[in-house]
């Protein structure tokens, strides 16, 4: 199914690209979220008239994400959790815990923006957590996990 991208989408392309995707992916995910429109003649003309507006929206979102990235990079968060003698935690620190701690420290982060490629944190210590604020913008959060008293 031919569609026109209204936003940058990973592994597909950028704003204005005409790409071929599976019909189910377009109908069930991309079109309901407003990320694409069908590539009909009328939609192509409509897109060309709205191109400047859409590009301005994308640039505005990117600038907002870069501003948030600067505040996240400057942030240092400490999480206290119960742990054993050797520094192993009773439980783990996951995406939600990190997002809640960062939000409590003053920078709003959604749990879906936190990237833990090696899974949840299970030991005490210092960690650098990757935060994906936009498809092109990543920030690094300094996280200290300490033993609770």
UniProtKB/Swiss-Prot annotation:
GO terms for cellular component: ribonucleoprotein complex; ribosome. One of its GO terms (biological process) is translation. GO terms for molecular function: rRNA binding; structural constituent of ribosome. It comes from the Bacteria. Keywords: Ribonucleoprotein, Ribosomal protein, RNA-binding, rRNA-binding. InterPro entries: Ribosomal_bL9, Ribosomal_bL9/RNase_H1_N, Ribosomal_bL9_bac/chp, Ribosomal_bL9_C, Ribosomal_bL9_C_sf, Ribosomal_bL9_N, Ribosomal_bL9_N_sf. Binds to the 23S rRNA. Belongs to the bacterial ribosomal protein bL9 family. PANTHER family: 50S RIBOSOMAL PROTEIN L9. This is Large ribosomal subunit protein bL9. It comes from Aliivibrio salmonicida (strain LFI1238) (Vibrio salmonicida (strain LFI1238)). The gene is rplI.
